[in-house]
């Protein structure tokens, strides 16, 4: 009797799955073809199908504010596969052409994977590259270059010189200061007129070669003043203005030195260029070095004079050598006498 009861229970248990399969076949919806199982996210475990459906509904509600902030969709697909190959297949043909930039330049940001798949909104990195473009990529306009060139050509002079009135003057010559004259007496400390001053020595061959060219400058620039002084006679002025070698040419505005001529080629043309670059005053045309400039007022030949400073230096050196020699001989005579006294 007990065996018969257990047998009926076993048949009833085995009959339930069979009865369910027949009902499913009659309705035309097999269990295995009812609907595909949704893709499981990494790290998520679902125990029942109701939990899966509920989870997808929660994700849809959470995605609605994000989609509203990013803008309208450019593609009906919401989530792409995280596999790069699957994401590239869903992209529009524009991304594969490399011409997504409006300027017609290839933008490397067009070929990146976007995990959100919202092409209408665009990636965050693409926006950053749009707002912060690399410097130097955009070519400068030709108009800006032309403006820069015109600005360089119209530069203001470094020294703003007040040109003197030359009305009624016909003879423009160089003035040479003697030993008793002071340079500051010929410069106006309260004015803005410019004067070119030459420090020279008559026994220097470089000063002599410069003399004809410097003598012709007053005719080329009649509105400027030109002075020359012997550096050996005005040693205090030479030290004051840093004259360590001659010839030395300084441009003064009033009583203030403004520029120094540092070229080794000291000719009339280089002096004209120097004055024009510093003051903006153009030289008169057809001014050349003449035979009169060779004669003076600045001498163009070496003047042979006695250098008394050199004579005094030689006399002092010879006297010191003679005194040292005499003292050395007397010391030699004293040393043997001292040795004899110690021996006794």
UniProtKB/Swiss-Prot annotation:
Protein task: Acts as a positive regulator of ciliary hedgehog signaling. Required for cilia biogenesis.
Cytoplasmic side: 327-344
Main location group: membrane
UniProt-annotated location(s): Cell projection, Cilium membrane
The entry's keywords: Cell membrane, Cell projection, Cilium biogenesis/degradation, Glycoprotein, Membrane, Signal, Transmembrane, Transmembrane helix
Transmembrane segments: 306-326
Protein name as it appears in the record: Thioredoxin domain-containing protein 15
Topological category with respect to the lipid bilayer: Single-pass type I membrane protein
Listed GO biological process terms: cilium assembly; positive regulation of smoothened signaling pathway
Biased composition (Basic and acidic residues): 88-97
Segments forming domain Thioredoxin: 163-280
Region (Disordered) location: 55-119, 136-156
Coiled coil: none
Signal sequence interval, chain numbering: 1-20
A Pfam family recorded for this sequence: Thioredoxin
Positions on the Extracellular side per record topology: 21-305
Cellular component, GO annotation: ciliary membrane; cilium
Species whose genome carries this gene: Mus musculus
Glycosylation sites: 171, 178, 190, 277
Glycoprotein recorded as keyword: yes
